[in-house]
Amino acid sequence: MNGIRDVVREEQPRERLLLEGAGSLSNRELLAVLLRTGSKEETVLTLSDNILHHFDGLRMLKDATLEEMMSIHGVGIAKASQLMAAFELGRRMVRLEYQNRYSIRSPEDCASYMMEEMRFLQQEHFVCLYLNTKNQVIHRQTIFIGSLNTSIVHPREVFKEAFRRAAASIICLHNHPSGDPAPSREDIEVTKRLVECGRIIGIEVLDHIIIGDHKFVSLKEKGHI
């Protein structure tokens, strides 16, 4: 009996999941369950190891593109699609859980809400959180991807969604891929422009949070709002 359990433990992650629960599996074993099979040359666990090694663990894997996944020997379009779909479902479930109950009372609350999703992004993402009168998140929208400047961040795109969602206020966020959240001159100019537009139309811009590598800066706390 022990011999059978040893085989299950080493070679059959799905069976181990059924016996011991998903929480008992390692990252490589969970990945193997999603992949289902290996290739003619290697087992599914070896393929899992290769994927994790290629992406330096889960940190980079969660944001890998279809092409990046398919560049690994043994990963075709079917396996790459399965992984991307699983990761996206995970992100949506986390987002839904927070969105259904998350109230923002401070810059720390806002940074905690978005930190893990934004801190590892390789390009700048400008995101808006739309809040109701209780400061609860009712919607979030990525406005654009790319370097932040006043010619790209148009108030129309920011406030259009606020009207659609009947939002009472907005919090803006963007990340610095360098990991340093110190605001640039462009960051400050964009913020002031959006704050002024919000004041005119009656939808307050509460803050602009810059996300770095596990740290953040609030432009409101810095006196720019």
UniProtKB/Swiss-Prot annotation:
A Pfam family assignment: RadC
Superkingdom in the source lineage: Bacteria
Annotated PROSITE patterns: MPN, UPF0758
Entry keyword annotation includes Hydrolase: yes
GO BP, sorted A to Z: proteolysis
Sequence positions that bind Zn(2+): H174, H176, D187
Family matches, as SUPFAM superfamilies: JAB1/MPN domain, RuvA domain 2-like
GO molecular function, one term: metal ion binding
Record-annotated MPN domain positions: 103-225
UniProt motif JAMM motif: location: 174-187
Assigned protein family: Belongs to the UPF0758 family.
Protein name: UPF0758 protein BcerKBAB4_4299
Originating species: Bacillus mycoides (strain KBAB4)
